[in-house]
């Protein structure tokens, strides 16, 4: 599997843009590099406005809800059972009730009924509602919704799961059906927008008090945290400690919430989901809907208990299935007739993480998929839809139901689908080399402005390398700690790892407060022996001395020169080099090569230049730090023979130094 894990160093920005970000955001070059790669160019980009999105059908749905309010119609809110669906359901049930609606929730039983609107439940829905409103589901329930409409029940579908070729009957509000919409709200996000549109129609202020519920759903569903989602999550995270909803407030207090998205992802959302996974989603929904503090406190305790049981079931299922997973198979398709359907999604994720293969699990007639590019989970299911009772989901995750007697045919079908694609690869994207220890406090503070971290806005990873020192085990041998170049590295759940003489670490910069002192450490995300490192702006650079490279070029070896290197192109044309595209060239000229014997060549070849680049830099100004960062990357790429990085770093070096060649150089 390690051959499908690729480390890549992110490219350096054009110098003018890099400096503009440094100036606009008042940060050093290290943080500016991270901001630039996320599209943050100005302070306003870090705080996008939270506005009403122009979703297709949104205003029509709000008008239908207003009519239902005025006529006293019974509204049934049919939500999904996961954290996104439950928070979205709570938003609309609470929000509509506050406006005087006759509204009640309905959540299907995860284990007995599964995902979506069931035909067997349609008679009950007909009896209980005049308006049927879905949250985080419904986009694939054509027959069920048509039955409701034909029997006089109005239907509004709010969803964000991958739609089919045609939308279902009824009034549909779905981000994917809005042309040119870049934003990706989740089920809870769409529910929040619908309530907002209704408030606007009624002349009321935006219902921002519901942003905390929507933020929990957005984070739980691993939505990209940029643009509108970023604005929503920032607003919601700030509101959680003093939430208007006592259940959410007490749950946050119980798990030690301090305002970070990661705490929602790994503490709050799993407890909400645990109730659903074990068939008791109504307890999580009651927690989000109750206004009674005593009831809320008891329900928080129940969610803790359910989460502990979920962890036990998960570990047992993983121990059973992981040995059956063949990491060489194009897809891992496993049946566990006695397995617990409620935890198989997490188990599938952990098997995917261990094998880097798409995983399809079936337990008691229920199924789950976890996948990674280039294989789409929902498209894989679509290739076998004639074998399924129902299905739905996204590229990365999906769910389905099936007759287990058809499992062999299903397995063959999805394996054939997966075989059409190249092997998935996990990329470890590294921002840069870890800065000098003296800069870590400032870099940490400046990077904190990137929060909330999450999908689409990952916490920056740094590269740290060298000979590990002072290695020791922690936590009864479960974890590993050691030092690299004076920086403490913590590798969680890696206690059995035998460190090589030299190691490369991809890690997160963290701040550790202890006894009144602050220390800056690296939390290892991945470790390995020194290997190839991808990155840079070209696939070829100087794997040999420049003079030798030029001599080989004169003998006819193919050369690539970037179009934005006119001096190099002119030199190559005059020298008669055979110019080729980068993927075909054996040599890549990453710097203007004239004059061959000038100071420029020293950077590539000379001992004097290497000593100059490795000398301790003077870091009094942001510009000095910018030069030091470029020098450090250049020296690293050259000495460790990473051609792509070296070619890019050479261009950056010339740009930040603007070296003047000696007069009279050839």
Swiss-Prot record:
InterPro entries: DDH_dom (IPR001667), DHH_sf (IPR038763), DHHA1_dom (IPR003156), RecJ_C_thermales (IPR054598), RecJ_OB (IPR041122), SSDNA_exonuclease_RecJ (IPR051673). Its EC number is 3.1.-.-. The keyword Glycoprotein does not apply. Requires a divalent cation; Mg(2+) > Mn(2+) > Co(2+). Structures with 1 Mg(2+), or 1 or 2 Mn(2+) were determined; the authors conclude 2 metal ions are required for activity. Monomer. Intact protein binds ss- but not dsDNA. Keywords: DNA-binding, Exonuclease, Hydrolase, Manganese, Metal-binding, Nuclease. Its cofactor is Mg(2+); Mn(2+); Co(2+). It comes from the Bacteria. Belongs to the RecJ family. This is Single-stranded-DNA-specific exonuclease RecJ. Mn(2+) 2 binds at residues 84, 136, 160, 221. Pfam families: DHH, DHHA1, RecJ_C, RecJ_OB. Mn(2+) 1 binds at residues 80, 82, 136.
């Amino acid at each position: 599997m390690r051959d499908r894990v690729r480390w890549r160093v992110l490219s350096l920005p054009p110098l003018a843009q890099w400096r503009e970000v440094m100036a606009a955001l008042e940060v050093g070059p290290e943080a500016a590099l991270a901001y630039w790669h996320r599209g943050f160019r100005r302070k306003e980009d870090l705080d996008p406005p939270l506005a009403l999105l122009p979703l297709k059908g949104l205003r029509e749905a709000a008008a239908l809800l207003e009519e239902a309010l005025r006529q006293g119609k019974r509204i049934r809110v049919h939500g999904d059972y996961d954290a996104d669906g439950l928070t979205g359901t709570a938003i609309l049930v609470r929000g509509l009730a506050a406006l005087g609606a006759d509204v009640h929730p309905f959540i299907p039983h995860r284990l007995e009924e599964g995902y979506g609107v069931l035909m067997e439940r349609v008679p009950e829905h007909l009896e209980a509602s005049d308006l049927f409103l879905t949250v985080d589901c419904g986009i694939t329930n054509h027959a069920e919704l048509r039955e409701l409409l034909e029997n006089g029940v109005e239907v509004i579908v709010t969803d964000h799961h991958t739609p089919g070729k045609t939308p279902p009957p009824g009034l549909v509000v779905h981000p994917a059906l809005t042309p040119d919409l870049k934003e990706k709200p989740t089920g809870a996000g769409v529910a929040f927008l619908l309530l907002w549109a209704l408030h606007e129609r009624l002349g009321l202020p935006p219902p921002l008090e519901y942003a905390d519920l929507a933020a929990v759903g957005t984070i739980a569903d691993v939505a990209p945290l940029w643009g509108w989602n970023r604005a929503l999550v920032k607003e919601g995270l700030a509101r959680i400690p003093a939430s208007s909803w006592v259940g959410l407030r007490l749950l946050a207090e119980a798990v030690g919430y301090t305002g970070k998205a990661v705490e929602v992802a790994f503490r709050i959302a799993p407890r909400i989901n645990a109730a659903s996974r074990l068939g008791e989603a109504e307890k999580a929904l009651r927690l989000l809907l109750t206004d009674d503090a005593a009831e809320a406190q008891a329900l928080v305790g129940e969610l803790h208990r359910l989460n502990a049981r979920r962890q036990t079931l998960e570990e047992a299922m993983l121990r059973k299935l992981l040995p059956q997973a063949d990491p060489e198979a194009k897809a891992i398709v496993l049946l566990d007739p006695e397995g617990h359907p409620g935890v198989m999604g997490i188990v599938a994720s952990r098997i995917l993480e261990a094998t880097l293969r798409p995983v399809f699990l079936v337990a008691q007639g229920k199924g789950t998929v976890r996948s990674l590019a280039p294989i789409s989970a929902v498209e894989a299911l679509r290739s076998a839809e004639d074998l399924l009772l129902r299905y739905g989901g996204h590229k990365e995750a999906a769910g389905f139901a099936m007759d287990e007697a058809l499992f062999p045919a299903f397995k063959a079908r999805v394996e054939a689908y997966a075989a059409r694609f190249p092997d998935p690869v996990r990329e470890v994207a590294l921002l840069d080399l870890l800065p000098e220890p003296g800069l870590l406090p400032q870099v940490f503070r400046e990077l904190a402005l990137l929060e909330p971290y999450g999908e689409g806005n990952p916490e920056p990873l740094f590269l740290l390398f060298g000979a590990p020192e002072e290695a020791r085990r922690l936590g009864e041998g479960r974890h590993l700690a050691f030092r690299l170049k004076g920086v403490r590295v913590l590798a969680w759940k890696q206690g059995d790892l035998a460190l090589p003489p030299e190691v490369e670490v991809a890690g997160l910069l963290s701040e550790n407060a202890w006894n009144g002192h602050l220390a800056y450490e690296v939390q290892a995300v991945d470790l390995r022996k020194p290997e190839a490192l991808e990155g840079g702006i070209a696939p070829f650079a100087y794997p040999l001395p420049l003079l030798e490279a030029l001599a080989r070029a004169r003998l006819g070896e193919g050369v690539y020169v970037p179009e934005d290197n006119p001096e190099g192109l002119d030199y190559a044309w005059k020298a008669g080099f055979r110019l080729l595209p980068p993927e075909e060239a054996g040599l890549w000229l990453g710097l203007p090569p004239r004059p061959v014997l000038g100071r420029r060549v020293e950077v590539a070849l000379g001992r004097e230049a290497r000593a100059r680049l490795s000398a301790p830099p003077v870091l009094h100004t942001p510009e000095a730090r910018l030069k030091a960062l470029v020098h450090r990357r250049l020296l690293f790429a050259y000495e460790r023979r990473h051609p792509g990085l070296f070619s890019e770093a050479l261009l950056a070096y010339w740009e930040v130094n603007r070296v003047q060649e000696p007069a009279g150089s050839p």
